[in-house]
A protein has these predicted regions:
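Long, basic N-terminal domains or extensions that often function
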Residues: 1-247
Length: 247
């Protein structure tokens, strides 16, 4: 089992957009992985004003195999009185890419059964991540330079890793890698992510808390500590706390 990371680094996104963006990002990641028949255990989403990221744990090495069944003409139409295949069943078999002899007879009809072996996950991921990127929706989008593809804000970097292997994704002349941007004032300006599993810890070591709930809790603790120090009571506005969490 592997861990998948996909981070999109942008210019500052509006705080009021962030909860919806991260919810949409998580749902898209889960939906696209399921549609691609790539088993996974859990998807977690992370965000700061300049980044959105998801980490999918327990990613299987290969797609699940698929069996598809197509119902064809009735046996009365498929074969003549002597049991020879008619043009109807020959056309059906040809359209399904199978021989007439491979058709299954059941319940008075013929069926084409096709088995498709699952592909290798890392081969499928570039297209899947590109699909997620282009499927994200926002209250408003921006276009920049001469690019046709718009986004909530211009994006300047992407990190896409399956464990420690870079998954190639490219959009608007930005190519994925294993390097993210650091805090504007603290720590390194560029940070190498050694593996998808180490994403959260690596950023925290560089003064970036990408876990939204952890960041909100820390802000609350600091507000309450200041209030207690001043000998007062802190009346915290939850809406304001939510906004500050994304600033």
């Amino acid at each position: 089992m592997a861990t998948l990371l996909y981070e999109i680094g942008t210019e500052e996104m509006p705080a009021q957009y962030m909860p919806g963006i991260l919810k949409n990002y998580k749902e898209l990641a889960e939906t696209k992985l399921k549609e691609a028949r790539i088993p996974f255990e859990k998807v977690s989403v992370y965000g700061t004003p300049r980044r959105m990221a998801f980490v999918a744990e327990g990613i299987a090495d290969r797609q699940e195999d698929m069996t598809a069944e197509s119902k064809g003409p009735s046996l009365k139409i498929a074969f003549d009185a002597d049991g020879n295949p008619t043009k109807a069943v020959q056309g059906f078999a040809r359209g399904q890419g199978v021989e007439v002899s491979a058709l299954e007879k059941r319940d008075g009809y013929v069926y084409a059964i096709k088995h498709t072996k699952g592909g290798e996950t890392k081969v499928l991921l570039p297209a899947l991540l590109d699909d997620i990127l282009h499927s994200l929706s926002f209250p408003k989008t921006m276009r920049w330079a001469d690019y046709d593809f718009g986004f909530v804000r211009p994006f300047h970097w992407m990190v896409a890793l399956l464990d420690s292997e870079v998954i190639p994704v490219e959009a608007n002349d930005v190519k994925s890698g294993n390097v993210t941007r650091g805090h504007r004032f603290l720590g390194s300006q560029t940070i190498t992510i050694p593996s998808a599993e180490a994403y959260v810890k690596t950023l925290e070591e560089n003064f970036i808390i990408v876990d939204v709930e952890k960041r909100r809790a820390l802000i609350r603790e600091q507000i309450e500590a200041l209030g207690k120090k001043a000998g007062g009571h802190t009346a915290i506005s939850e809406d304001l706390l939510d906004e500050v969490t994304y600033l």
